[in-house]
Amino acid sequence: MTAGVPQDAVSDAAPRGGPRGLSTKEAVERRSRFGTNEVHEAAPGTGRLVLSQLWGPVPWMLEVALVLEASLRQVPEALILGGLLVLNGILSAHQEGRARAAIALLRQRLEVTARVFRDGAWQSCAAREIVPGDYIHVRMGDIVPADALVANGTLEIDQSMLTGESTSVGRGPGTTIYSGSIVRRGEADASVTATGTSTYFGRTAELVRTARAESHLQELMLRVVQYLLALDAALVIVFVTASLVHGVNLALIAPFVLILLIASVPVAMPATFTIAASIESRRLADRGVLVTGLSAVEDAAGMDLLCADKTGTLTQNRQTVTDVRSLAPGGDSELLALAAAACDPSTQDPIDLAILAAASRTGHPSYPRSAFVPFEPATKRSEARIDHDGQSWRVVLGQPAIIAGLVARPPGTDDWLERRGGEGYRILAVGAGPEGALQWIGLVALADPIRDDAPALLGRLAELGVRVVMVTGDAPPTARSVARSLGLSGPVGERGDVAHASAEYSGFAGVYPEDKFDLVRSLQAQGRIVGMTGDGVNDAPALKQAEVGVAVASATDVAKASAKIVLTRPGLEGIVLAVESGRRVYRRMLTWMLNKISKTIQIVLLLVAFATIGLFVTTPLLILLMIFANDFVSMSVGTDQARISAGPDQWDVRRLIMVGASMAFGWLLVSFAVVIVGAYVIHWPLATLQTVVFLELVFSGQAMLYQVRERGPFWSSRPAPALLIASGVDVLVLGILATFGILMAPVSPIIIVALLAIVAGAAVALDRLKLWAFRTSGIVTATVGGTTTG
């Protein structure tokens, strides 16, 4: 079946390629003719990216306010609102564009590879380089890289990603396999018939999908807005009532009401998160950790339990012969040479390779082999016919119980088996001899050594408050031995314990890939934020179910497509780095959120308090200008230094509100003092007072930002250069506007300097209030390590 494939591509390309494959020259010629094997994804342009930032709950609030301001003919306010929208849209679009570009580069690094027969030899190449006529080899776990006609071998193909049908279909010689389908079982050679946009389903570009899950930050943002709007609504009622009592025209009140509500909208939050997450994503990529979406960085911050595959993550994924018990006349070397005769190097089986490597190190000559039967699940052994000193011998290699069924087990073997088995070794027995006279030759013990860096990295995860649970398909004795070696505490569960799993277990043995999904759900039901590592096709559901799905370095294409994080290096280091990056993003966003909550409460209470006595201490225009100025500075928090918390980070809106309100009340006293002194002691004109209050609110907002960014005294760490520069520019520009009376009544530079001094002194005094609020709320956990800047 060649639907959707140009006829010349089939009739000309496929037959000539045939089993012999193509040469590099032919492949280059066909690539220039048919194009690369990919479907280009249309990337949104800059304009479209900007417009996309103007659609959503936060932009809607501002857009409604803009329309209302315009309808009330408040032109300056409407222009500033429009400027807020456009500025945040452009900045968010710029950062999202950079993030898309970074993720596109990561997708190239995650590029699907294929085995292709070129220039007379099998070789690996990027799937996008395949051309019609290429001869490819696919096996279990692969994503089919192009439409192809099976030449030999049998496959079980999952086309659910293409057709939606979950039932696998069989494919054999003469049948077509389609690009984007998954090989569930078997292996086969096939001739490529179509590539790129000519494939039947045209899905090559989406073989590795970018995760597009919504960030939890969006939910948090809406919850915070709900709290603040509820507070605003109550205060607005007081404000309107008091204003009407003092005979203020309703037309003058309406703009104030709108601005009070706008003050609660976290306009710059999405842009700040994108900046913070993009910085960490790029840092992770430099260390070999690829994230498929920015939300993955945030999710890693809250992970408190990691289900880690034993093989390759905690161990070296390299079977090694560690001990032998030989009864062969030639000793250990003859035993290993006979065992090697029953191994097949072409399968790349790790056990076969370990025995072959051990045999080669002994220097014993290999035995000529006349026949070979590879390992089969039905017989649980492999066999070979060899020439042994001129005699035809049969050699069998398999589990001791299987070989014991073919030949008598010598006395004394059981003790050795029990001891090594209890230590977690994988043991194989070797039988050999003339047909009908097999003898027990000996035993070979193998183990997968623990990675050198595993204990230290497990210790680091423990410092970060992440408990590690080992998951393995090995037998319980092996799992217990490895858990002891790694220092993991707790019992080792078995497959039957998965349904009622808990964090008390140090690991689970005898687990099939299909059980991992149930394990993740069981732990999530107990309120755990779960990370799961995986590498196989059957790991995909568990990787998607886990909050933090991690595809390890050796993962199949399907596992990588299902994970939020993809490691390019073996071991746990990449996971540690992801957790640390997530914690830094959380700290930066916590700083932003606390500053926003505190500032909103301070502004609303200040305006409403004095409005009740008929004094409007600032104007709607100046409030909007203040929001604009504060957003400009607060977005640079995304680049700031951040300490790494010692425990999983979880958002608690009520505690955020509590800390924010505490800080707001402290700074509210400063604002009250400025208004009272200015209005009733110095007797400034109202316009001058409004400018002074505006400047005090802007300066105190910046001071509060520097306070909440540091969990200890605010002078404990140096802010990032971008934050200092943004603050300096903000103060300078607003100082110039105030001095020359642009958009506000002019004030003397002496007053501006005095306000800066007052705010600086208040920041030092109120830092004790901040420390008390953090301590009593419990919102901030202990930290580990130093600060890290973006």
Model segments located where?
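Actuator/coupling domain of P-type ATPases
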Residues: 19-20, 30-42, 87-94, 98-109, ...
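Juxtamembrane coupling segments of multi-pass membrane pumps/enzymes
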Residues: 90-145, 151-152, 161-172, 275-299, ...
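Conserved beta-strand/loop elements of the cytosolic catalytic core of P-type E1-E2 ATPases, chiefly
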Residues: 91, 121, 193-196, 208, ...
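Hydrophobic alpha-helical transmembrane segments
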Residues: 80-111, 118, 212-305, 461-464, ...
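Cytosolic catalytic regions of P-type ion-transporting ATPases
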Residues: 11, 80, 111-222, 426-429, ...
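Membrane-embedded transport module
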Residues: 239, 243, 277, 347, ...
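Cytosolic catalytic regions of ATP/NTP-dependent phosphoryl-transfer enzymes
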Residues: 299-440, 446, 459-460, 468, ...
